[in-house]
C-alpha cells in the first residue's frame, strides 16, 4: 500500500488563460494578461509512489480546481516560459482524460525555485529506485581476478629491518664505498736518489766550510797506500846503494 506525501505547498498561485503557441520559440509570459489572472488559489505537489501530481485547490474549502499529472520534468506536463522564472505552462487533465494548457504564476521567485527543486529531487529519487530494481533482476557480473594461463607477474621486494634500516648486505656496501680510491702502496714516500748523488749530498753536508781545493780526494785510502809503497821502494834503493858502497 502506497501513501501520499506532500512535497510542497504554496498558499497563493495565479492561473492564466494563454494564447496558442505561435512558433517553436516557446511560451512567453509577456503575451498573457498578467494583471487579471483567471483564478487564484492554493497549490500542492503530492507524490504517491513514483507518480507526482500538481493539484490546484481552493484556498478556503480545499475544493479541487484542476489536476496536473507530471510524468517527467522538464517535459510536456510542466514547462518554464522563456522570459521569466516565475511563470510556467502546465497541462491539466480532468477525469475523462481531456487536457488543457494553462499559465501558472507565483508572486515570488523563491516559490518558483522551490517548485523546481521539489520536482528535480522527486525524479532523481525515481531514477535511483529504477536502478535498484534493475540491479535486483539482472545478474551482477563478477570480476575474474585470477591469473590466465601463461600469465606471470614480477614483484620487486625491499626487505627492511624492524628499526627501519635496510638489509645487512646493502648496508655494508654503502659503508665500504666512500667514493674515493685509496692511494697506491708507498705512494706517500719520497723516491730514493741515486747512490752517487746521495754520497755527494752527504759530503757537502758534513763539511760545509771547506773549499773544493782543500777538500780531500774521494780515494784517499788508495793514494796513501800508493805513497807508502813508493817510500818503501826508495828506502830499499838507498839500502842497496849503501850495501854496494860498503
Curated annotation (Swiss-Prot):
Keywords, ordered alphabetically: Endocytosis, Protein transport, Transport
Coiled-coil region: none
Region of interest (Disordered), ranges: 156-246
Motif (WXXF motif): 243-246
GO CC terms of this entry: clathrin vesicle coat; clathrin-coated pit
GO biological process: endocytosis; protein transport; vesicle-mediated transport
InterPro entries, per the entry: NECAP_PHear (IPR012466), PH-like_dom_sf (IPR011993)
Amino acid composition bias (Polar residues), ranges on this chain: 166-177
Compositionally biased spans, kind Low complexity: 227-246
Pro residues: bias regions: 181-196
Family from the record: Belongs to the NECAP family.
Physiological role: May be involved in endocytosis.
Domain remarks in the Swiss-Prot or TrEMBL record: The WXXF motif mediates binding with the GAE domain of proteins.
Name of the featured protein: NECAP-like protein CG9132
Lineage: Eukaryota, Metazoa, Ecdysozoa, Arthropoda, Hexapoda
